[in-house]
C-alpha cells in the first residue's frame, strides 16, 4: 500500500457564497501552477475539495509545494481504496502504521456515498475493532483526544483514508482580490510586503527601477530571483524594469539634496500610476514601514502620495525591522535580499533628506526636472518579463 493522494481543504473561500466556484477555479489553477515540476501529478476539483493524484510521485516534495499555496486551509495525505469493508480495514491499519509513536486512536467514518450499505457508526466499530485486534494491546481507543484520528471518507468514486492534517498557507487564492502594481526594490521589505498581499488574494505585478551603470546586471538578476521566489506561492508574476538613470542623474543635478529623495519617489509614483492605469490595475503597493527612513514619515508619504489617486497599499506600515527580517527568512527571500548589489535607492543617497517635505516646495523643484518628458521616456524604455518558477521570458503582449 502507498499514500497516493493528497486531499486539499479550502480556507476562507468556502465562505464566498455565489463566488465560491470562481474562487475554487483560481485555487485549482494556482495549485496546478506550483505542481508543474511534477509531470505525473494531477489536481482535480471534486466533492467540495481538491484531490491531488500523485501517480507514483513521492508525496513529500508535492506536499511541500502545496504548503505554500494561498487559499489552502489544510491538506492530508490519503490512501484511496475500493468501497469494500475489508479494503477499508486494511487501509486504516496501514495508515496507523505510519504513526509508530501513537498510543491512542479513533476512527471517524463519513459516508457521503449513501448507497454504501454500512452506516458511519458501524464502520467506526468494524474498522476500529480490526485495528485493535491487529495491534494486540499496543493501541487504545480515545474518542476525545486521540493521538491519531483515522478519517474514512466514503465517496462514490472510492474511499479516501487519512490519518493526519497539515496546515496550509490559508488566506485567499492569488488573483481572487484583483491586481496590484508592487514597487519591488532589491531589499528585505518589499518582497515581504508582496507576499502579504498575495496572501489576501492580490495578484502582484512587480515594478523595479534600475539605474545602469550605477546598478549592474547582478542587481537586476537579484530582483528576478526575488520575483521567482515569490512565484512558488501561487502563479507566474509579471516583472517590469523601468530605466531610471536619466531621471535620477537629472534630479541629482537640479534638485537640492534635502529634496532629492522626495522628488525621486514622486517620479517613481508618477510612473507607477501611469503604468497601473495602462494595465487596468487598481492599486499600487510598496514595502514602506512608518518612520523607518526619511521618505517613510507621514509627512513624506503625504507629499509623495500626491502623485496618484490610486490606493497606495503599505502592508508593512506598522511592522518593525526585526519582524520583517524574521518574515523574510520564513518565506525564503532573506538570503537573496541581503546580496550586496546596489539598487537605485542606494545611489546618490543624500544625508540631509527632509523628513517633512512640503508639497509646494516639491512642485517648485520639479519645474527643473522636465517631468513629463522624463516620464514618457522612462515608460517607453520599460522591459517586461514573465517570471515563473523555472524561467523568465519576454511578455507576449507588449503594452509599452
From Swiss-Prot:
Signal peptide extent: none
EC annotation? 2.8.1.4
**Which reaction(s) does its UniProt entry say it catalyses?**
[ThiI sulfur-carrier protein]-S-sulfanyl-L-cysteine + a uridine in tRNA + 2 reduced [2Fe-2S]-[ferredoxin] + ATP + H(+) = [ThiI sulfur-carrier protein]-L-cysteine + a 4-thiouridine in tRNA + 2 oxidized [2Fe-2S]-[ferredoxin] + AMP + diphosphate; [ThiS sulfur-carrier protein]-C-terminal Gly-Gly-AMP + S-sulfanyl-L-cysteinyl-[cysteine desulfurase] + AH2 = [ThiS sulfur-carrier protein]-C-terminal-Gly-aminoethanethioate + L-cysteinyl-[cysteine desulfurase] + A + AMP + 2 H(+)
- Which EC main class describes this enzyme? transferase
Q: What is stated as this protein's family in its record?
A: Belongs to the ThiI family.
Can the keyword tRNA-binding be found in this entry's annotation? yes
Chief place where the protein resides: cytoplasm
- Functional summary from the UniProt entry: Catalyzes the ATP-dependent transfer of a sulfur to tRNA to produce 4-thiouridine in position 8 of tRNAs, which functions as a near-UV photosensor. Also catalyzes the transfer of sulfur to the sulfur carrier protein ThiS, forming ThiS-thiocarboxylate. This is a step in the synthesis of thiazole, in the thiamine biosynthesis pathway. The sulfur is donated as persulfide by IscS.
PANTHER family to which the protein is assigned, alphabetical: TRNA SULFURTRANSFERASE
Native organism: Shouchella clausii (strain KSM-K16) (Alkalihalobacillus clausii)
Compartments where found:
Cytoplasm
Name of the encoding gene? thiI
Which Gene Ontology molecular function entries are recorded, alphabetically? ATP binding; CCA tRNA nucleotidyltransferase activity; tRNA binding; tRNA-uracil-4 sulfurtransferase activity
Name the UniProt record assigns to this protein = Probable tRNA sulfurtransferase
> Which cellular component, as a GO term, is one annotated location?
cytosol
Q: What is the lineage of its organism?
A: Bacteria, Bacillati, Bacillota, Bacilli, Bacillales
Key words, A-Z: ATP-binding, Cytoplasm, Nucleotide-binding, RNA-binding, Thiamine biosynthesis, Transferase, tRNA-binding
Amino acid at each position: 500500500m502507498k499514500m497516493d493522494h493528497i486531499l486539499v481543504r479550502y480556507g476562507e473561500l468556502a465562505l464566498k457564497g455565489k463566488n465560491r466556484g470562481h474562487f475554487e477555479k483560481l485555487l485549482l489553477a494556482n495549485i496546478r501552477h506550483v505542481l508543474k515540476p511534477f509531470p505525473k501529478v494531477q489536481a482535480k476539483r471534486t466533492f467540495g475539495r481538491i484531490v491531488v493524484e500523485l501517480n507514483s510521485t513521492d508525496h513529500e516534495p508535492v506536499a511541500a509545494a502545496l504548503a505554500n499555496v494561498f487559499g489552502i486551509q489544510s491538506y492530508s495525505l490519503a490512501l484511496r481504496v475500493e468501497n469494500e469493508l475489508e479494503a477499508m480495514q486494511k487501509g486504516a491499519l496501514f495508515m496507523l502504521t505510519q504513526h509508530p509513536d501513537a498510543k491512542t486512536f479513533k476512527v471517524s467514518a463519513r459516508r457521503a456515498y449513501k448507497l454504501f450499505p454500512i452506516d458511519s457508526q458501524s464502520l467506526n466499530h468494524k474498522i476500529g475493532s480490526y485495528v485493535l485486534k491487529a495491534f494486540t494491546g499496543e493501541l487504545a481507543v480515545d474518542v476525545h483526544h486521540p493521538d491519531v484520528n483515522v478519517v474514512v471518507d466514503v465517496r462514490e468514486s472510492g474511499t479516501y483514508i487519512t490519518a493526519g492534517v497539515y496546515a496550509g498557507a490559508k488566506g485567499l487564492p492569488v488573483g481572487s482580490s484583483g491586481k496590484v502594481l508592487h514597487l519591488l526594490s532589491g531589499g528585505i521589505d518589499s518582497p515581504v510586503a508582496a507576499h502579504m498581499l498575495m496572501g489576501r488574494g492580490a495578484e502582484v505585478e512587480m515594478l523595479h527601477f534600475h539605474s545602469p551603470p550605477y546598478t549592474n546586471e547582478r542587481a537586476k538578476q537579484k530582483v528576478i530571483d526575488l520575483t521567482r521566489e515569490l512565484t512558488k506561492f501561487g502563479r507566474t508574476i509579471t516583472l517590469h524594469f523601468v530605466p531610471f538613470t536619466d531621471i535620477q542623474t537629472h534630479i541629482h543635478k537640479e534638485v537640492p539634496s534635502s529634496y532629492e529623495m522626495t522628488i525621486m519617489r514622486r517620479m517613481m509614483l508618477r510612473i507607477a500610476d501611469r503604468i497601473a492605469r495602462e494595465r487596468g490595475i487598481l492599486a499600487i503597493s510598496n514595502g514602506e514601514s512608518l518612520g523607518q527612513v526619511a521618505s517613510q514619515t507621514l509627512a513624506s508619504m503625504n507629499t509623495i502620495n500626491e502623485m496618484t489617486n490610486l490606493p497606495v497599499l503599505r502592508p508593512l506600515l506598522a511592522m518593525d525591522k526585526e519582524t520583517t527580517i524574521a518574515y523574510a527568512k520564513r518565506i525564503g527571500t532573506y538570503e537573496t535580499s541581503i546580496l550586496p548589489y546596489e539598487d537605485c535607492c542606494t545611489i546618490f543617497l543624500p544625508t540631509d533628506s527632509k523628513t517633512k517635505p512640503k508639497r509646494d516646495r516639491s512642485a517648485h523643484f520639479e519645474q527643473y526636472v522636465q517631468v513629463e518628458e522624463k516620464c514618457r521616456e522612462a515608460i517607453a524604455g520599460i522591459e517586461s518579463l514573465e517570471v515563473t518558477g523555472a524561467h523568465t521570458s519576454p511578455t507576449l503582449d507588449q503594452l509599452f
